């Protein structure tokens, strides 16, 4: 989006790789510290996730005595290089002010590694069923892949920068949204299929934004493009369809009173449901493609004008609830199972930025500027609000649905945590290697939509 906030960062180069390799060689065979008992993953399972051998980066020699031949050198490097694939333990934290991504173990609290892809990590995603990391930046016309087991990296050149990345479950495919095009990349053979149709605007004044938002249904491999200038959705399938396959236009103008174009949104894994905002922030919309049916939140913003006043909508893991909110504190929630098509309205006394759910979808979470709220789906009065001074930069819920992780824009870089079951705060985990902890990603999550 043209008003999308980008992670601001400076360039930097990772140093001390040889020293790291030497230290790893001395520690060969030593695993992570045992996880503490309780609800965390078992130490045995975590060790299996995080200790798989892999090939060393090209051109890096192991420290210690010289090997006798290439095969011996290769085996020595395999023993030295450690996998950083542990989807239930490792959190990848992007720095707001540099190129660095810190890898932190949320079980032991240890710093695992700092990664540098020589680009600002505005876009960072991990596969949920594979050991693959993808990183992009609005300033680089390329995407970087890293196999977290083997540590192999591959940069794939693209026609324009990447703004959105979606891993396709049970495949080696990634859907991407570029500056004005969308397409798919295979990280098995790194082939690129970019669809020829462009989604741009006559109003473009800079190259570091888009004038559309891509929603992607991961199971059906559906591309849903929201037009920022017009109240239209453009739809097509990826997969084996020809590059020049036609796009279907879905006109929502009769459903939007303000006549605004479309803003941001999220799609269910199949072609059942889209949740989106209008670009002017006046309302949120639910679109059901099979019935060509639209539900509206009604007016959201009350007075004034703000920059992207509505935040990203949220569809829970079971597609039962859809939640909309704006930065002024207005919240609208649809119950698609027991509701009557009308949203339940709420008002909070802080400025929301993120919506999430947890503890097996019994609780929804609203986090933002100076506050975080936990509320039961069944009982709206069962609510807890925690107030603080900083703003929440990003939020993630662990795959077991029990822990909310978030970062703040003040203080030392850290991963802050809440136990969603008790709604009590857990001790923060210090994040090394970054100036300000911002975006959070893990290889596991409690919602397929995210």
Task: Say what each PLM segment does.
Residues 10, 26-450:
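Predominantly soluble domains enriched in secretory-pathway, periplasmic, or organellar proteins
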Residues 5-25:
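N-terminal export signals
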